[in-house]
Amino acid sequence: MLTKSSVIYEPRGKALEYSQLAVNLYSGCGHRCEYCYAPAFLRTTREIFHQPAPRKDILQKIIVDARRLQLEHEARAVLLCFTCDPYQPIDQQYQLSRQAIQVLHSYNLDVMILTKGGQRAERDFDLLAGNDWFGVTLTNLDDNVSLKWEPDAALPDERINSLFRAHEKGIKTWISLEPVLYPEVTLEIIKQTHCFVDKFKVGTLNYHPHSKSINWHRFATDVKSLLTELKCDYYLKEDLRKWL
């Protein structure tokens, strides 16, 4: 049973729609995404949040939690990560993501990756198999737009290429289409990637004024229609479903 001191935790609210278990390896994130909700959620400033560091004793704490979950015959995958990116630039130095995957696997736990790290994440493809999932967040297809909203994340093409290579290796793939910044671009992402993506999860844009410029009813209708037409496996988050 997980406790308040556990680093593997059961997300609440909107995050629970993406994964029932998660672990955050780093405090903060170096991708500096303009729309990121994590600083507010963690009650810290963006300046502090954008100076990431490994969480203290994180691997040892994962071992404690993973051992407990194995004894309980846990079947749910553990997501890396919600409040940071597992393959942000400093992971090249610390390689916590690789070590965390190895620990989780040693206790028969599956992993679900969510990243904007692009090629950095491919380092660990040799570890992913079976019921593991590799996923990326995609908000746009234009490099200049990406540099505006996600200045230090991998560019969109690099993320898409990493998805394709994961698919070629037989790894289950998924895309988080959240936040939605430009609905027509989100639809185009689906058209360009559906042949090598096993699941799409689609949300909205929360806690940002740009959200008011989007016709959410139209987007919800259009994206559901497209995903159905292409026979994709998909999940629409509650924030989007309410617009249907």
Question: Where would I find each of the regions flagged by the language model?
Answer:
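Conserved AdoMet/S-adenosylmethionine-binding subsite of the radical SAM
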Residues: 58-227
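N-terminal [4Fe-4S]-dependent radical SAM core
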Residues: 1-77
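Short, glycine-/Ser/Thr-/acidic-enriched flexible segments
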Residues: 55, 85, 241
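Acidic carboxylate-rich catalytic motifs and surrounding loops in phosphoryl-/glycosyl-chemistry enzymes
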Residues: 115, 179, 230-244
